[in-house]
Structure formats: structure tokens, C-alpha cells
């Protein structure tokens, strides 16, 4: 964005959409273990995610960010995939904690070894459990990623055939 000397802001539609998307994230949380408690603490008054435009939603159909917090077991994986598919585009995923990111400290047969095996993940937040500051860091990293991504489609040149001069029909 650029501002002229007369106070007029010059920008593109793509930049306005990017600004709106990154400054009004509506996450839906899938709290599966102790990381969910830290996620709730992040939304409380001390950290206040509302000031960043982050409003937690109860339905995936109203959300654009999925925060997976905690251990994902194989039995829950299809439901998590369904929640992801119900979200409208564009959508982003944050994997919160070591259990969601890599399966946790004890790799066992019912535990999914990373949520990225079933849905694409945009930001990984380390920790067991991650602190509220770490979740805020992850959200800010996601905002940087949204700002850097270009949403518009590339223009392609389509060759145009110019009709040749028509010749009069002779009788």
C-alpha cells in the first residue's frame, strides 16, 4: 500500500483481501488433550486474542483456521478430516504441541504420528504443552504467511486472431 501526498491510499484488491484475512482469523479448535487448556488460557483476559481480531467459533463452517491441540488417535482422524473439509476456503491449519505435530513422546499403534498425515498443516507450534505466548507466536506466523501468499490468479496471454481484410465477392 502506498499513500499519496493528498492522503489517498493506493492499493490492490489482493492486498485488501490479504489484510482482511490476516486480521480477522476465526479459528475452530479441536482440543484433544492438555494443549487445549493452554489454548483456552490464550483467549482469556491476560492475552486477549480478540484484540488481534481472533474470535473462536463453534462451527467449522464459520471458521478459516483449524487449531489441532493434543494427541490425535486413529479413531478421531476421520472426524478431524471431516471438520477440515467442512471449512470454507481459504483455510489454514495450526498444529499445536508435540502430540499433534509428531504423535507425542510415546509412539504407539493407536496414535497418529502427526496431524499432517491427514490434513495439510501451515504452522507447527512446539511444546508440551505450548505456552499461550507460543500459540500467539504461531498465530502471528500464520498472519505473516497469509500476507506473503498471493491469492490472485496469474493472467495468461491469449492470442487473438485478427481477421484478414475481406475481399469483395466477384460475380
UniProtKB/Swiss-Prot annotation:
Give yes or no: UniProt keyword Membrane. Answer: yes
Which gene holds the coding sequence for this protein? nuoB
Question: Does the keyword section mention Lipoprotein?
Answer: no
Per its record, the protein catalyses: a quinone + NADH + 5 H(+)(in) = a quinol + NAD(+) + 4 H(+)(out)
Q: What is its EC number?
A: 7.1.1.-
Its lineage opens with: Bacteria, Pseudomonadati, Aquificota, Aquificia, Aquificales
| NCBIfam families (alphabetical) | nuoB_fam (TIGR01957), PRK06411.1 (NF005012)
The residues listed in the UniProt record as binding [4Fe-4S] cluster, with positions renumbered to this chain, are 34-35, 99, 128
Subcellular locations according to the entry: Cell inner membrane
Which InterPro entries does the record associate with it?
NADH_UbQ_OxRdtase-like_20kDa, NADH_UQ_OxRdtase_20Kd_su
**Cofactors named for this entry:** [4Fe-4S] cluster
The note on the cofactor says: Binds 1 [4Fe-4S] cluster.
Q: How does it sit in the membrane?
A: Peripheral membrane protein
Q: Which coarse location class applies to the principal site listed for this UniProt protein?
A: membrane
Alphabetized HAMAP family for the sequence:
NDH1_NuoB
Q: Which PANTHER family match?
A: NADH DEHYDROGENASE, NADH DEHYDROGENASE [UBIQUINONE] IRON-SULFUR PROTEIN 7, MITOCHONDRIAL
Write out the function statement from the record. Answer: NDH-1 shuttles electrons from NADH, via FMN and iron-sulfur (Fe-S) centers, to quinones in the respiratory chain. The immediate electron acceptor for the enzyme in this species is believed to be ubiquinone. Couples the redox reaction to proton translocation (for every two electrons transferred, four hydrogen ions are translocated across the cytoplasmic membrane), and thus conserves the redox energy in a proton gradient.
- Short name of one Pfam family: Oxidored_q6
Q: Which PROSITE patterns match?
A: COMPLEX1_20K
The protein's name: NADH-quinone oxidoreductase subunit B
Q: Which UniProt keywords apply?
A: 4Fe-4S, Cell inner membrane, Cell membrane, Iron, Iron-sulfur, Membrane, Metal-binding, NAD, Quinone, Translocase, Transport, Ubiquinone
Gene Ontology terms, cellular component aspect?
plasma membrane; respiratory chain complex I
